[in-house]
A protein has these predicted regions:
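The Walker A/P-loop phosphate-binding site
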Residues: 3-106, 130
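Phosphate-binding/switch region of NTP-binding enzymes
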Residues: 44-45, 50, 54-55, 148, ...
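C-terminal regions of RecA-like/P-loop NTPase motor modules
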Residues: 3-6, 10-12, 16, 142-145, ...
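Conserved beta-strand segments of alpha/beta enzyme cores
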Residues: 108-110, 218, 333
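Conserved inter-motif catalytic segment of the P-loop NTP-binding fold
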Residues: 27-28, 49, 75-168, 172, ...
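Anion (oxyanion) recognition and catalysis
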Residues: 65, 178, 182, 314
Length: 344
């Protein structure tokens, strides 16, 4: 690739590195989780406390270490190492048991607890700080062939020079982190909490500056299911490099021997979007849908094509997402039959 140097005219006479697009090498996006978590890029996972965000990302990390299939059926990749930065959970009493419950290959899970530095009093351990330690983390990722770096939670690792609520401050930091991800090829998953502001677009619900989700190439909200508080949903908030991935749900299954819970993924996608889940559907609309579906079921016993149900519901003014919630509440199942689906 040829470097073209264009000299800026003016008092500063600075220099820019410029090259024509014809000399830019075409590249294909690589994926850790195909269609959801791009390799060499930044991804955000956000949610309220107690939505099992950390358990979720450790489940994903475990799959990377073993090459296990992805929850939506996407093919696994070759097993690889992961770097784990966790500021809120204990390594021995929480993180290791969760990794074991998820079936991780523990030897490939590198727990980045602190950095050893030389000081006036000799060798010292100090907490990891961003952006100060980005180059060090990148070297660690390269030396261990890590495919995934988890930062849980992002805010806990920010230097006091970084204002997480100021766009420019955050973007400068994430530009460095994104460059390190691109250089190493590792996906960087940053976990953060949702803010407390009700409503509004899903893009603006994450804690801190909008620059965080702006710098990420993919972002997901981890939310409680409005119909079942014990059920969680992972909904796409942003997807720059692939079509928006469908919402996927999961439950938590206790593992008494380890004293933690593991993720149990749903077998199919959920039709609701992040915006719908965050805004919530009116209880009156759901109640009307439940009443309508109860009556419809009484007049349509046995297995009925799902297309018929959707058509009849549409004529009654019930959107598919509300119908889905009503069907779940009533325990009406769907089944694959040949080329289509049936209910009953």
């Amino acid at each position: 690739m040829t470097d073209h140097i264009v000299t800026e005219r003016g008092a500063s006479r600075g220099e820019w590195d410029v090259l024509p697009a014809s000399e830019v090498a075409r590249e294909t996006v690589r994926w850790v989780w195909p269609g959801r978590i791009p390799a060499g890029k930044l991804t955000v996972v956000e949610g309220d406390p107690a939505t099992a965000k950390s358990t979720l990302v450790l489940d994903l990390a475990a799959r990377v270490t073993t090459g296990a299939p992805w929850p939506d059926g996407e093919a696994p990749s070759q097993p690889a190492s992961v770097l784990l930065l966790s500021a809120e959970d204990g390594w021995g009493d929480t993180i290791r048991p969760r990794l074991e419950a998820a079936g991780a290959e523990l030897s490939r899970c590198l727990c980045v607890a602190a950095r050893r530095v030389e000081g006036d009093e000799g060798s010292l351990l100090r907490p990891v700080v961003l952006p100060d330690d980005i180059a060090w983390i990148a070297r660690l990722a390269e030396s261990s062939n890590a495919a995934l770096v988890v930062v849980d939670v992002l805010a806990a690792y920010l230097s006091d020079r970084v204002d997480s609520h100021k766009d420019q401050s955050v973007r400068r930091l994430l530009a460095q982190l994104g460059a390190a991800a691109a250089r190493t090829g590792a996906a960087v998953v940053m976990v953060r909490h949702l803010n407390k502001a009700p409503g509004g677009p899903a893009l603006y619900r994450g804690g801190g500056s909008i620059g965080i989700v702006g710098a990420a190439r993919a972002a997901y909200a981890v939310l409680r299911d409005p119909d079942d508080p014990s059920h969680r949903l992972v909904a796409t908030v942003k997807s720059n490099l692939a079509p928006e991935a469908p919402t996927w749900g999961y439950g938590l299954v206790e593992v008494p021997a380890l004293g933690v819970a593991r993720i149990e993924w749903d077998q199919s996608a959920d039709p609701r979007s992040a915006a719908e889940l965050l805004a919530g559907l009116g209880s009156s609309a759901l109640g009307e849908a439940v009443a309508w579906l109860t009556e419809w079921r009484a007049t349509h016993p046995g297995e009925v094509p799902a297309a018929r149900l959707l058509s009849d519901a549409a004529e009654a003014g019930i959107p598919p997402t509300t119908l889905h919630r009503a069907r779940k509440q009533l325990g009406i199942e769907t089944r694959k039959r040949g080329e289509g689906w049936t209910v009953g």
